[in-house]
Amino acid sequence: MKLRFAAALPILVLVLAVSARATDITGQWTATFSTQVGEQHYTYTFKVDGEKLTGTAKSDNGTVAIENGTVKGDDVSFVENLDYQGQKLVITYVGKISGDEIKFTRDVGGAAKEDLVAKRVK
């Protein structure tokens, strides 16, 4: 009995380590979605290093570096600090990764919440 447990333990540890690892979303993702100010077209370029997420968010309003990005398992979050018509706007993203899609909810400066789906560019 002890021998079976000892043999199974390394396999269990490996399975847990792989499942807890951040999903690699490195690359380009696109999204088109409706907002209070019209249809938005985004290209996100992500780079994952461990649980740290960096990259850019490019929209019709310009390109900005994403900040405070994390990927933990299938959960992803980051902040986009956008200059919109001369006003600073903080947009906070929280999402769930599922294969080649990320379902995001973004909080636009506390004034609006918007749902969108970003798809991996292949």
Language-model features, listed with the residues they occupy:
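Bacterial N-terminal signal peptides that target proteins for export
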Residues: 1-9
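Bacterial N-terminal signal peptides
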Residues: 8-17
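Sec/Tat signal peptide C-region and signal peptidase I cleavage site
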Residues: 18-22
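Central antiparallel beta-sheet cores of small beta-barrel/beta-sandwich binding domains
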Residues: 23-122
